[in-house]
Amino acid sequence: MATTTATTPPSLTDIRALKYTSSTVSVASPAEIEAITKTWAETFKIPNDVLPLACWDLARAFADVGASSKSELTGDSAALAGVSRKQLAQAIKIHCTIRQFCMYFANIVWNIMLDTKTPPASWSKLGYKEESKFAGFDFFDGVNHPAALMPADGLIRGPSDAEILAHQTAKQVALHRDAKPTWHKRCQLC
């Protein structure tokens, strides 16, 4: 490596010597996902070959109701009868947030929805239009995220510009709506 100090301009060869792996606090790490599935296997006796299906099913269910600890899940995991999605979600909270878990599987959820032609359940209620309905889930930011798990065959298709814009707009509206009560209370004190 020709670069000898942090202030020496690096060559492209020097830069290529760095083997960087993307990580962020907004997406669960592979180690956190492994810890979650280990907890599930031990607690609920879920066979190893079913664990990926349980992850995908749970993340897909959160796409319908929102990826929050306050979200209400119903039913058993489609991967294993007798184990409720609610039980699986509780075990996630030991290792990371629900949103971080879902962000890790966003690309998988995206492909599931496109393949089954089934958008998130609340897309219309959230104000998404027909052409952007598949972006109507709150962890859509995980689609194409470098720290999210990518399907072996890639995405069925990437998000369209309309889907990206619709999600960004919905996100800003939600942030404004969530901030309004605080702003409103401050104004009442004036």
Swiss-Prot record:
Function statement: Required for genome encapsidation. Forms ribonucleoprotein complexes along with TGB1 helicase and viral RNA.
Taxonomic lineage of the native organism: Viruses, Riboviria, Orthornavirae, Kitrinoviricota, Alsuviricetes
Naturally occurring in which organism (per UniProt): White clover mosaic virus (strain M)
Protein family membership: Belongs to the potexvirus capsid protein family.
Protein's name according to its UniProt entry: Coat protein
Compartment list: Virion
GO CC field: helical viral capsid; ribonucleoprotein complex
Molecular function in Gene Ontology: structural molecule activity
Keyword terms, alphabetized: Capsid protein, Helical capsid protein, Ribonucleoprotein, Virion
UniProt entry tagged with the keyword Ribonucleoprotein: yes
